[in-house]
Amino acid sequence: MARIAGIDIPSDKRVVIALTYIYGLGNKLSHKILNELKIDQNIRVKNLTEQQLSALRIEITKYNVEGDLRREVTLNIKRLMEIGAYRGLRHRKGLPVRGQKTRNNAHTVKGKPKAAIAGKKKNKVN
């Protein structure tokens, strides 16, 4: 397993697919990086030379990936909440942010239904 950007990349997969295991690198960006470095996209990670791996590491450091990207996203959301923006309020309430309706679905954001379950009624003995 090769280690790039603090992530162990699976060695039996193709390089294009393996790069997508890094948070912030999708299919399109991995294609772009490999084209810039002139590395074959169908080659397996285990067949890469040390020079190619080091070139990949250097190229990936140019992009905002993994911990830095996660931190940036959370800080952006926190900033929206602090300034009182509508999107920040939606994040705070745990509701959809991008204008979706909430009458029916939106369960992935809202979580499980919090319906009140009636307790068992006890008989009063007089």
Curated annotation (Swiss-Prot):
GO terms for cellular component: cytosol; small ribosomal subunit. Residues 94-126 are annotated as: Disordered. Keywords: Ribonucleoprotein, Ribosomal protein, RNA-binding, rRNA-binding, tRNA-binding. Disulfide bonds: none annotated. Residues 109-126 have a biased composition (Basic residues). The keyword Nucleus does not apply. It comes from the Bacteria. PANTHER family: 30S RIBOSOMAL PROTEIN S13/40S RIBOSOMAL PROTEIN S18, SMALL RIBOSOMAL SUBUNIT PROTEIN US13M. Belongs to the universal ribosomal protein uS13 family. Located at the top of the head of the 30S subunit, it contacts several helices of the 16S rRNA. In the 70S ribosome it contacts the 23S rRNA (bridge B1a) and protein L5 of the 50S subunit (bridge B1b), connecting the 2 subunits; these bridges are implicated in subunit movement. Contacts the tRNAs in the A and P-sites. This is Small ribosomal subunit protein uS13. It comes from Aster yellows witches'-broom phytoplasma (strain AYWB). The lineage of its organism: Bacteria, Bacillati, Mycoplasmatota, Mollicutes, Acholeplasmatales.
